[in-house]
Curated annotation (Swiss-Prot):
It is found in: Cytoplasm. This is Phosphoribosylformylglycinamidine cyclo-ligase. InterPro entries: PurM-like_C_dom (IPR010918), PurM-like_C_sf (IPR036676), PurM-like_N (IPR016188), PurM-like_N_sf (IPR036921), PurM_cligase (IPR004733). Gene3D superfamilies: PurM-like C-terminal domain, PurM-like, N-terminal domain. GO terms for biological process: 'de novo' IMP biosynthetic process; adenine biosynthetic process. Its EC number is 6.3.3.1. The keyword Kinase does not apply. The gene is purM. GO terms for cellular component: cytosol. Coiled coil: none annotated. Belongs to the AIR synthase family. Keywords: ATP-binding, Cytoplasm, Ligase, Nucleotide-binding, Purine biosynthesis.
Length: 355
């Protein structure tokens, strides 16, 4: 410490210059997320968005925030930081689209004990990539350097997304009825849930993140587990434009089918799912075998191969499937809406997972 000039903020562990340099580095990434309604420029005290410029007439705003859980620990341990930002965006915007809302803008929070500009820039680039895929603007964020609160290279993330839907088009609808069909959209793998259990399986088996993934040739275990969460926004917006047949959507995250599907059901209804219809990605079978995890625990922890579920009228299911395929999706018929059982869970399973 320079006693003549006194103690500085940098000597206390916070480097303002590094933070400013980071902002300059990420500005091109942020600008690339521009869209109607937002110029995606950094530097102001707050981000701006013009709903009229985005084409909305009588919108309802929908907001969501989320994180990526302990998946971020795998990014830190492998040094692969370029896709964890995509996960962050996906977890937020998928929660908007299930209510019928088009994602409009996004803000992020990055917290660490010591700012590593290259790491932070890689994370923000991933966030910008996710925003571009979702069609929303990255209009601001916060980088917090907090020495003593985080150790080593640890960091954490939070995301905040806002979307809009025209009044009268909110989901879920109130006309869900027995006989409606469930259509599932495939996940890319684990997405961003269950990683505390994943890390326990890795630790118990002495598995190396740098070693080959036993179930996915050509990738390391770390690369495979860090496969980013799918963003379902564009295909679902395409479906909304093509047909008015979607009654409800559910983002399958922590808690699986039995926790997330009832959130969109009216009272008096349940769901019957055929587990044998699922094309379960190999990572889930590997985890179940290596960890000795029962099917019931897999179902309540992971998405098991389905990241999004649509509820549609039986007689309009083919139209929705056609629109989904035109958008590049491969929908799977999972089951149907049934009258709620008098006792027991509202989601019942038939068949078995192919783990």
């Amino acid at each position: 410490m320079d006693k003549k000039n006194g103690l500085t903020y940098a000597e206390a562990g916070v480097d303002i210059d590094a933070g400013n340099a980071l902002v300059e580095t990420i500005k091109p990434f942020v600008r690339a997320t521009r869209r109607a309604g937002a110029d995606a420029e950094l530097g102001g005290f707050g981000g701006l968005f013009d709903l009229k410029a985005a084409g909305f007439q009588d919108p309802i705003l929908v907001a969501a925030n989320d994180g990526v859980g302990s998946k971020v620990k795998l990014a830190i341990e492998t040094g692969q930081h370029d896709t964890i930002g995509v996960d962050l965006v996906a977890m937020c915007v998928n929660d908007l689209i299930v209510q019928g809302a088009e994602p409009l803008f996004f803000l992020d929070y990055y917290a660490t004990g010591k700012l590593e500009p290259a790491t932070a820039a890689s994370v923000v680039k991933g966030i910008a990539d996710g925003c571009r895929e979702a069609g929303c603007a990255l209009i601001g964020g916060e980088t917090a350097e907090m020495p003593g609160l985080y150790t080593g290279k640890d960091y954490d993330l939070a995301g905040f997304a806002v979307g809009a839907v025209e009044r009268g088009h909110l989901l879920p609808r109130t006309d869900i009825a027995a006989g409606d069909l469930l259509l599932g959209l495939p996940s890319s793998g684990l997405h961003s849930n269950g990683f505390s259990l994943v890390r326990r399986v890795l630790a118990d088996n002495g598995a190396s993140l740098d070693g080959p993934a036993p179930y996915e040739p050509g990738k390391t275990l770390g690369e495979s587990l860090l496969t980013p969460t799918r963003i379902y926004v564009r295909p679902l917006l395409h479906v909304f434009a093509a047909t008015q047949a979607v009654k409800a959507l559910a983002h399958i995250t922590g808690g699986g089918f039995q926790e997330n599907l009832p959130r969109v059901l009216p009272a008096g209804f349940g769901l019957a799912l055929d587990l044998s219809a699922l094309a379960v990605p190999p990572v889930f079978g590997w985890l179940a075998r290596e960890g000795g995890i029962a099917e019931t625990e897999m179902l309540r922890t992971f998405n098991c191969g389905i990241g999004m579920v649509l509820i549609v009228a039986n007689d309009e299911a083919s139209k929705v499937e056609e629109a989904l395929r035109a958008a590049g999706e491969q929908p799977i018929r999972l089951g149907s809406v049934i009258p709620a059982p008098e006792t027991g869970p509202r989601v019942t399973f038939q068949g078995q997972l192919s783990l």
